[in-house]
Design a protein with these regions (language model features):
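Alpha-helical membrane insertion/targeting regions
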Residues: 1-161
Length: 161
């Protein structure tokens, strides 16, 4: 493992990576069924800040242009920013289920699903995490895809959120 690819990246990528890593790490503490009360609320505000920072910083990253300067990550960032507002609106209006589903959706698809693609060989995180064996990125992508498929099946069966 080498931190050099991250240190050599632009400031926007550094901020984006740090904020996304923070959101990824906080998720399990916030989204457990027993996470309620003041700690949940406090960590939730921090998670919202991390997600907003991740989304906003992506608008300064221009690696994969699809339409003009925009890439799929930019469209995901718009989705995340609207999702954060929606989740906040839900909880302010007492819709706990809508809030939980929106927040979990952003975690599963905005953090985990999007995050596994950063492990593709040639990408910065792949070079940082697997400099000697870039193919390991595919292994982590496969494991992440299996987790997401499991989540989708559980969600469609009504077992989550």
């Amino acid at each position: 493992m080498s931190i050099n690819p991250i240190l050599d990246a632009s400031s926007a990528i550094k901020v984006h990576t740090l904020a996304a890593s923070f959101a990824l790490t906080l998720g399990p503490f916030i989204f457990t069924p027993k996470a309620r009360g003041k700690l949940h609320k406090f960590l939730g505000y921090i998670w919202i800040l991390a997600m907003a920072t991740t989304a906003i910083s992506s608008f300064f990253i221009y690696g994969f242009k699809l339409i003009w300067v925009f890439s799929p990550i930019h469209f995901l960032s718009i989705f995340i920013l609207f999702g954060l507002c929606r989740a906040f609106w839900y909880i302010r209006n007492g819709n706990v289920i809508g809030h939980a589903r929106t927040m979990l959706g952003m975690y599963w698809y905005g953090v985990l699903a999007a995050g596994i693609f950063t492990l593709l060989p040639g990408r910065m995180l792949n070079r940082a995490l697997f400099p000697e064996a870039p193919w390991l990125g595919y292994l982590f992508i496969a494991c992440g895809a299996l987790l997401i498929i499991r989540h989708i099946r559980r969600e469609s069966a009504g077992l989550v959120g």
